């Protein structure tokens, strides 16, 4: 069901105080109803470190990552910052996930859109991002497969191919790999394409999917 692995909020602002309010809101619900899950506000990792320092109930530390140093720099992170965030998450000893306190999002095309792919193809860059993720023992690694738009994944067929490629490479690396099955409104794709990809990933043994209404993430 929805929320088995994490209940997440994509915030409208990176304001630290607002992030703390959202974390406390979700924690109150989880504690009240004794839900065996984790919460996460999908804010920048440096903000999560700040909320932790202020005593916020942080279960999972979120960050978007890429497969080259330049891509990660465009996201405002490097391996040192991710290591600091990982240690901060471990120090809280919360949730039900042991030492798996990181939640990473990836997606084909991010390195190309940042002009940080150094001539590599989208899938090679994506697989390299999974190697970054694996270093930090994540609970979740999530490819947001269609978010990049038709400039990089043109239509439903390309989004479907990318989703299956990402799932395959995640499995090869032994990651807790999942998929946010989604598409942009200006891509040559529709809800049927997303439902087809959902079915294919289910048959392929995908660990989890993001339950977004209308696949409109």
Describe every region a protein language model picked out.
Residues 1-217:
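Anaerobic metallocofactor- and corrinoid-dependent redox/one-carbon enzyme cores
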